[in-house]
């Protein structure tokens, strides 16, 4: 919005020329997201408490979690506001990739909101059924990926980390593959959101990493030099990624141990879906497995646990997802959280290193 209002004035007032620079608008998207979080945060928490939108704690989980009972949830509403407002203010709103990403983030946020509202406000313990959630997740992801491939003409080739000349073309199989990336990322982040600040930290780190890759993907010279896929217009996603980083840090202010508010499904599903569609648009789908390694491990721990118990009658972990396994082994919650953040930073650096290690 500000881009469209103020940049045209650059012809008469040179100061407004700064609005053409992605770096300037990205930095201020981060700052705006932080400001929105700090201004709206206390108000959102009070409203959630008034709605009695309080987290229900599993009785079969770690005993230390019982004291969290009654903490407001659905704080993902604050995250969404802190992403959408800066994006609308600082991004080029004629960019199709910005709107596609917002469509996925808000669509998945609506799924999570509906599930959370049924569970914590209407006291319907079932919420949305797994089938219902999966249906809507697949529908939204399918709509977004079909638009990108069939309308926007996005390449269906894959970029394989560490191999600069390996670009397998999936053709129309790319559509179900892209859907899998978005849905998988969404649910993986959802499974990770089990400790105070555990999910939002890695999400912010992932968003910062994709900020860099979006900027490179949208720059013809940089993408050619680094031999990464060139996606005209993808650079504008750096602004949205900046908003995600700011929103993540701003939410962490309230979600850090001991948490004042939880993000709920409205936050975890939307953030995961956002990371997934960012990976698809920037043509770094496989890189998401590296930078989002914590989310991958969390999801795999649940899959292996369920599979092992179903077919062998034995559990691999004391409890899944794996962060609960470490809790039951006696590792303090804050230590688990910070260690997972550190691992994510290392994985992000490895992901960035693939720009030259080819």
Swiss-Prot record:
The keyword Transferase applies. GO terms for molecular function: metal ion binding; phospho-N-acetylmuramoyl-pentapeptide-transferase activity; UDP-N-acetylmuramoyl-L-alanyl-D-glutamyl-meso-2,6-diaminopimelyl-D-alanyl-D-alanine:undecaprenyl-phosphate transferase activity. Its cofactor is Mg(2+). InterPro entries: Glycosyl_transferase_4, PNAcMuramoyl-5peptid_Trfase, PNAcMuramoyl-5peptid_Trfase_CS. CDD domains: GT_MraY. It is a multi-pass membrane protein. Keywords: Cell cycle, Cell division, Cell inner membrane, Cell membrane, Cell shape, Cell wall biogenesis/degradation, Magnesium, Membrane, Metal-binding, Peptidoglycan synthesis, Transferase, Transmembrane, Transmembrane helix. Pfam families: Glycos_transf_4, MraY_sig1. PROSITE patterns: MRAY_1, MRAY_2. Pathway: Cell wall biogenesis; peptidoglycan biosynthesis. Its main location: membrane. It catalyses: UDP-N-acetyl-alpha-D-muramoyl-L-alanyl-gamma-D-glutamyl-meso-2,6-diaminopimeloyl-D-alanyl-D-alanine + di-trans,octa-cis-undecaprenyl phosphate = di-trans,octa-cis-undecaprenyl diphospho-N-acetyl-alpha-D-muramoyl-L-alanyl-D-glutamyl-meso-2,6-diaminopimeloyl-D-alanyl-D-alanine + UMP. It is found in: Cell inner membrane. Catalyzes the initial step of the lipid cycle reactions in the biosynthesis of the cell wall peptidoglycan: transfers peptidoglycan precursor phospho-MurNAc-pentapeptide from UDP-MurNAc-pentapeptide onto the lipid carrier undecaprenyl phosphate, yielding undecaprenyl-pyrophosphoryl-MurNAc-pentapeptide, known as lipid I. HAMAP family: MraY (MF_00038). This is Phospho-N-acetylmuramoyl-pentapeptide-transferase. It comes from Geobacter sulfurreducens (strain ATCC 51573 / DSM 12127 / PCA). The lineage of its organism: Bacteria, Pseudomonadati, Thermodesulfobacteriota, Desulfuromonadia, Geobacterales. The gene is mraY.
């Amino acid at each position: 919005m500000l881009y469209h209002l103020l940049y045209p004035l650059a012809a008469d007032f040179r100061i407004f020329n700064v609005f053409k620079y992605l770096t300037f608008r990205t930095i201020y998207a981060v700052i705006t997201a932080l400001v929105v979080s700090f201004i709206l945060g206390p108000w959102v928490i009070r409203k959630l408490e008034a709605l009695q939108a309080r987290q229900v704690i599993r009785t079969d989980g770690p005993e230390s979690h019982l004291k969290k009972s009654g903490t407001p949830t659905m704080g993902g509403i604050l995250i969404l506001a802190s992403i959408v407002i800066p994006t609308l203010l600082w991004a080029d709103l004629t960019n199709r990739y910005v709107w596609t990403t917002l469509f996925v983030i808000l669509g998945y946020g609506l799924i999570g909101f509906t599930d959370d509202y049924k569970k914590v406000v209407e006291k319907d313990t079932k919420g949305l059924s797994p089938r219902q959630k999966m249906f809507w997740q697949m529908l939204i992801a399918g709509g977004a990926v079909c638009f990108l491939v069939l309308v926007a003409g996005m390449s269906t080739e894959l970029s394989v980390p560490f191999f600069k000349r390996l670009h397998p073309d999936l053709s129309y199989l790319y559509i179900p593959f892209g859907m899998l990336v978005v849905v998988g990322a969404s649910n993986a982040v959802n499974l990770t959101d089990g400790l105070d600040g555990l999910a939002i930290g890695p999400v912010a780190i992932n968003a910062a990493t994709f900020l860099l890759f979006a900027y490179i993907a949208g720059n013809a010279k940089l993408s050619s030099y680094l031999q990464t896929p060139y996606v005209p217009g993808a650079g504008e996603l750096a602004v949205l990624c900046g908003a995600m980083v700011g929103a993540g840090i701003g939410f962490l202010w309230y979600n850090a141990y001991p948490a004042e508010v939880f993000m709920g499904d409205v936050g975890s599903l939307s953030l995961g879906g956002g990371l997934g569609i960012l990976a698809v648009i920037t043509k770094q789908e496989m890189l998401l497995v590296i930078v989002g390694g914590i989310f991958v491990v969390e999801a795999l721990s649940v899959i292996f646990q369920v599979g092992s118990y179903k077919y062998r009658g034995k559990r691999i972990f004391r409890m899944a997802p794996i962060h609960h396994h470490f809790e039951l082994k006696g590792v303090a919650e804050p230590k688990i959280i910070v260690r997972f953040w550190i691992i994510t930073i290392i994985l992000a650096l490895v992901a960035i290193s693939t720009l030259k290690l080819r």
